[in-house]
A protein has these predicted regions:
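Histidine-centered metal-chelating micro-motifs
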Residues: 45, 66, 80-82, 86-92, ...
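Short acidic-glycine-tyrosine-enriched beta hairpin
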Residues: 10, 71-86, 208-224
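A cytosolic small-molecule/anion-sensing beta-strand core signal
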Residues: 61-62, 77-78, 198-199, 214-215, ...
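Conserved short histidine dyad/triad with adjacent acidic residue
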Residues: 35-51, 172-188
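A short, N-terminal "cap"/entry segment at the start of jelly-roll beta-barrel domains
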Residues: 1-33, 41, 117-170
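Fold-core signature of tandem repeat domains
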Residues: 37, 58, 103-105, 174, ...
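Glycine- and acidic-residue-biased ligand/ion/polar-headgroup-sensing regions
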Residues: 53-65, 190-202, 207
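Ligand-binding loop in jelly-roll beta-barrel domains
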Residues: 30, 86-113, 167, 223-248
């Protein structure tokens, strides 16, 4: 999926590059890739493995996933985020009884989307992933439950919760209402800023246009792309910065 470096992206629920009945690619860039995955109760995910050069992250939208985190195992219900730093052994599956839907984020992409294309076609493809026979090592994935995280509560209708802060990727959940003025049009030179609307509607300012986006919409602003947003009612979204580029630190200072 080739993108003009200066053009923002807006994809509504179900839109994107569909690889099969489960996987829809939302963004593929060197800095980050995002795909939305919808699996049934019989889904068996990858066994224990690690990545040397990128962060592998997840946000559970519906259902639950079971994660291997080092030698530990945990259940991640809807609203849980997981960010796995390089060299941490991890794996995941759907424990059932129902289906699950989640976002999978790789920062940088490290050829993950190209790997998926080959895997769907039944072809081998070498990328930054290394299988291990048994889980080992520390449980150092950053796991944050639905009501957890570093909450930055503002007096004007905004709560910004830091879910993960690493050099390569930071994750936030913003909850707000129309009392908050939102964010004026701006751009970043050093990272990709993207959003997934979890609930409600938001007016996004993308380039010279304003678009109303609802639940399940994904928006990405590559470096140089002008973007901003205006709340119109209670809403929440996942905000993703890749790389972090100091954004989490600046959020604390606001």
């Amino acid at each position: 999926m080739e993108l003009d470096v200066a053009q923002p992206v807006l994809l509504r629920h179900g839109e994107g590059e569909r690889l099969n009945e489960r996987i829809v690619v939302k963004l593929e860039r060197p800095e980050i890739s995002v795909n939305e995955v919808d699996v049934g109760p019989d889904f068996v995910g990858p066994g224990p493995h690690f990545h040397k050069n990128h962060v592998d992250a997840f946000y559970v939208l519906e259902g639950q996933l079971e994660f291997t985190n080092g030698t530990e195992t945990l259940l991640a219900p809807a609203g849980t985020s997981v960010a796995v730093p390089p060299n941490i052994v991890h794996g995941f599956t759907n424990p059932g009884p129902g289906g699950a839907r989640y976002l999978n984020i790789h920062a940088p992409d490290a050829d993950f989307i190209e790997y998926l294309r080959h895997a769907v076609a039944g072809e081998e493809f070498s990328w930054d992933s290394y299988d291990v026979d048994e889980p080992y090592g520390p449980a150092e994935a950053i796991v944050v439950g639905p009501d957890d995280g570093e909450r930055l509560v503002r007096p004007f209708g905004l709560t910004n919760t830091i879910r993960a802060e690493t050099t390569l990727l930071s994750l936030f959940v913003l909850e707000f209402d129309e009392r908050w003025e939102g964010v004026d049009p701006h751009h970043h030179d050093d990272h990709v800023d993207s959003f997934f609307i979890l609930d409600g509607e938001v007016d996004f300012l993308l380039g010279d246009e304003t678009t109303r986006a609802g639940t399940g919409t994904y928006v990405a602003a590559p470096p140089g792309a002008t973007h901003g947003f205006r709340p119109i009612a209670p809403a929440s979204f996942l905000n993703i910065h890749a790389p972090d580029a100091g954004f989490a630190g600046r959020a604390r200072g606001r």
